[in-house]
């Protein structure tokens, strides 16, 4: 089941991360971040991404609110880090 955290279409190349340190030094333009849960540390690295897919995360969390205000699409999908792999094309409407 897909739940929308922040409205918008997500289209891009998947990058699955276990922790925020996994994305340091990586070009995130046109990427869709796949992560277990939303984290405030992630916020400063979000502006060039196409969207986020999370396994966990509350609709009213600080990070969720930020994503909506920044118009960054975010969907919650159970077991997303097991479903998606790095480099595949992702499209969610």
What are these regions (language model features)?
Residues 7-32, 36-93:
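Acidic, glycine-rich flexible loop/linker segments
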Residues 1-6:
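Amphipathic alpha-helical
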């Amino acid at each position: 089941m897909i739940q929308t955290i922040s409205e918008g279409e997500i289209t891009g190349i998947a990058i699955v991360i276990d922790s925020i340190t996994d994305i340091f030094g990586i070009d995130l333009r046109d990427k869709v971040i796949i992560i277990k849960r939303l984290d405030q540390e992630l916020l400063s690295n979000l502006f060039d991404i196409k969207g986020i897919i999370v396994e966990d995360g509350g609709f009213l969390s600080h990070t969720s609110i930020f994503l909506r205000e920044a118009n960054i699409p975010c969907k919650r999908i159970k077991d997303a880090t097991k479903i998606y792999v790095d480099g595949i094309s992702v499209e969610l409407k």
